[in-house]
């Protein structure tokens, strides 16, 4: 039994998200939440919310026991980049790319 939760279009770079996702892959859910709580990264807060959503989905939809759940898969994929322009000298402009990503978490026995 597997349950998924996704979060799309997060204002976070893929590399920073994957750094935190690698910390909890394959761990028990309570251990993963503990790791995320004490990790001082912006990505940890975002991934913790998605993980809590996946746990709630498993409990509500499938009646799963929380003590037996593990983080089966977690991956962070690249989303569309937001493009912004900033003014430069002599009437020119430079492009600023603000990356987004998609977070996918699957929990199961």
From Swiss-Prot:
It comes from the Bacteria. It holds the Pfam family Ribosomal_L22. GO terms for cellular component: cytosolic large ribosomal subunit. Keywords: Ribonucleoprotein, Ribosomal protein, RNA-binding, rRNA-binding. GO terms for biological process: translation. InterPro entries: Ribosomal_uL22, Ribosomal_uL22_bac/chlpt-type, Ribosomal_uL22_bac/org-type, Ribosomal_uL22_CS, Ribosomal_uL22_sf. GO terms for molecular function: rRNA binding; structural constituent of ribosome. This protein binds specifically to 23S rRNA; its binding is stimulated by other ribosomal proteins, e.g. L4, L17, and L20. It is important during the early stages of 50S assembly. It makes multiple contacts with different domains of the 23S rRNA in the assembled 50S subunit and ribosome. Belongs to the universal ribosomal protein uL22 family. Part of the 50S ribosomal subunit. This is Large ribosomal subunit protein uL22. It comes from Albidiferax ferrireducens (strain ATCC BAA-621 / DSM 15236 / T118) (Rhodoferax ferrireducens). The gene is rplV.
């Amino acid at each position: 039994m597997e349950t998924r939760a996704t979060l799309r279009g997060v204002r976070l770079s893929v590399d920073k998200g994957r750094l935190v996702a690698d910390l909890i892959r394959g761990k028990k859910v309570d251990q993963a939440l503990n790791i995320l709580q004490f990790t001082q990264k912006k990505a940890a807060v975002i991934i913790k919310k998605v993980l809590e959503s996946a746990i709630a989905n498993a409990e509500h939809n499938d009646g799963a026991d929380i003590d037996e759940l593990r983080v089966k898969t977690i991956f962070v994929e690249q989303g569309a980049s937001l493009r912004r322009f900033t003014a430069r000298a002599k009437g020119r402009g430079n492009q600023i790319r603000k990356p987004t990503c998609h977070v996918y978490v699957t929990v199961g026995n």
